[in-house]
From Swiss-Prot:
Belongs to the AFG1 ATPase family. The gene is Afg1l. It is found in: Mitochondrion membrane. The keyword Cytoplasm does not apply. Coiled coil: none annotated. GO terms for molecular function: ATP binding; ATP hydrolysis activity. GO terms for biological process: mitochondrial protein catabolic process; mitochondrial protein quality control; mitochondrion organization. Its EC number is 3.6.-.-. It holds the Pfam family AFG1_ATPase. Keywords: ATP-binding, Hydrolase, Membrane, Mitochondrion, Nucleotide-binding. This is AFG1-like ATPase. It comes from Rattus norvegicus (Rat). InterPro entries: ATPase_AFG1-like, P-loop_NTPase.
């Protein structure tokens, strides 16, 4: 066996491993996210769409799922098949949600949004069924059961997207639409123009079913348009299925100008049934076969040399030279100091100390299947900006199945230390002054750090799963 620092020998024999589900008991990850293929211009948001593993050589990790697809006709039968095959453990909380999704799958058979204007859709006899909003703690299987549903639902056009990526695309569409408007003539008042309705119509023409993973609202720009956007989508006949860590009532909790967001909650509950999936088990943290050693402490001897060797071994499999890499992101340049083919060697400072955002991390995820992240510090609310960037980075890497090798100052379980931050800290006072907020606003989540603490629980759970053999198999783009 190779030296203990190398995960690659473990991975070479990983195809012989038995499927244990997405974090054992949480089911197989039955789909993967790929970067969009080059070709004619497609809707921007398809870059975030999850697609099935078509044309990929099957491995032991996908055999049970493939057998289930061959004989089952719905998510409930698929779930029972995996339990009988001992790939999942029966979880009554999961089963209850799968039963709801089974009913929705049956109700949606043959459903399609009718052509015509909004008026004709409102009075159509082909009324869409209510969607489903599934919420619960991290690692309980929400994504797995939604993915089972997505595999079987029979509608003409459907899309499965990460909610953060979807909203990023919506803002791009808004910008593009505004840019296409005629320029205002000097001396003339510009007419107000609302781009939300036409964008909702555009999306409705592309999909009659939207499945959202990780439905969460942390950005005020998203919060202010959600009611109008989704009201238009629902009235156009779009059916929504979503997973979230929060119940609808807690979305954007303590957010800035939340009073303007609250009406969206009523809209969501009018068009979606709500069901909780909370078995009290984080299946990602159960015993799984590790993919070798992928997480190092910076205090370990020669850790820098070890990670250099890991990069060199990975780079040898690339048909490329090691050099700096420049990525184009929305007209900007994102420079990485060291990359080879689809492997990048980065420091935490490169990725999270610079002013980068979701669009940058999305571009990284599409260009690299393996990323080394060196010198991750221990986080606290004193470094809130870096915390948010790291959460967004890991969310994007996880969704695209990017494989990571890390060095950090502390173990995963200790990465975040909560220290109560006085709302009267210098940083908070400056921000409140800049926003023109009174002391009464000190309880907002942007000052208490509540949203970061909540989201980091998901990050820790995902980091744990990203160390497993199964995750590394699924992230191997050379098989695709």
């Amino acid at each position: 066996m190779a030296a203990s620092w190398s995960p690659l020998v473990t991975l070479r024999s990983a195809a012989r491993s038995r499927l244990t589900g997405r974090g054992v008991g949480c089911g197989a990850r039955v789909i993967a996210i790929f970067p969009p293929a080059p070709g004619p211009r497609k809707p921007l948001w398809k870059a975030y769409t999850v697609q099935t593993l078509e044309g990929v050589r099957p491995t032991a990790a996908s055999e049970a799922h493939s057998r289930a697809l061959a004989v089952c006709h719905g998510p409930l039968a698929h779930y029972d098949f995996l339990i009988k095959a001992q790939e999942l453990k029966n979880d009554e909380h999961q089963r209850r949600v799968v039963q709801c999704l089974q009913k929705l799958q049956e109700d949606l058979k043959g459903y399609n949004i009718e052509e015509g204007g909004l008026f004709s859709k409102l009075f159509s006899r082909n009324k869409p069924p209510k969607g489903l909003y599934v919420y619960g703690d991290v690692g309980t299987g929400k994504t797995m059961v939604m993915d089972m549903f997505y595999e079987y639902v029979e509608v003409k056009s459907k899309r499965r997207v990460h909610f953060h990526g979807f909203m990023l695309d919506v803002h791009k569409r808004i910008h593009r639409l505004k840019q296409s408007l005629p320029k205002r003539k000097v001396g003339f008042m510009a007419k107000s123009y609302d781009p939300i309705a036409p964008i909702a119509e555009e999306i409705s023409q592309e999909a009659s079913l939207l499945c959202f993973d990780e439905f969460q609202v942390t950005d005020i720009a998203d919060a202010m348009i959600l009611k109008q956007l989704f009201e238009n989508l629902f009235k156009n006949g779009v059916v929504v299925v979503a997973t979230s860590n929060r119940p609808p009532e807690d979305l954007y909790k303590n957010g800035l100008q939340r009073a303007n967001f609250v009406p969206f909650i009523a809209v969501l509950k009018e068009y979606c049934n709500t069901v909780q999936l909370d078995s009290g088990v984080d299946y990602r943290k159960r015993e799984l076969t590790p993919a070798g050693k992928l997480y190092y402490l910076t205090s370990e001897a020669d850790v820098g040399t070890v990670m250099d060797k890991l990069f060199d071994e990975l780079a040898q499999k690339q048909n490329d030279l090691t050099s700096p890499r420049i990525l184009k992101v929305q007209g900007r340049e994102l420079r990485l100091n060291k990359a080879c083919g689809t492997v990048a060697d980065c420091t935490f400072e490169e990725l999270c100390e610079r002013p980068l955002g979701a669009s940058d991390y999305l571009e990284l995820s599409k260009n690299f299947d393996t990323v080394i992240i060196r010198n991750i510090p221990q986080f606290s609310l004193a470094k809130r900006t870096q915390v948010r960037r790291f959460i967004t980075l890991i969310d994007n890497f996880y969704d695209f199945k990017v494989r990571i090798i890390c060095s950090a100052s502390v173990p995963i379980s200790s990465l975040f230390v909560y220290q109560h931050q006085d709302s009267e800290s210098d940083q908070s006072r400056v921000l409140m002054d800049d926003l023109g907020l009174s002391q009464d606003s000190a309880g907002l989540s942007m000052f208490t750090g509540e949203e970061e603490i909540f989201s980091f629980q998901r990050t820790l759970s995902r980091l744990t799963e990203m160390q497993t053999e199964q995750y590394w198999i699924e992230g191997d783009r050379s098989r695709k």
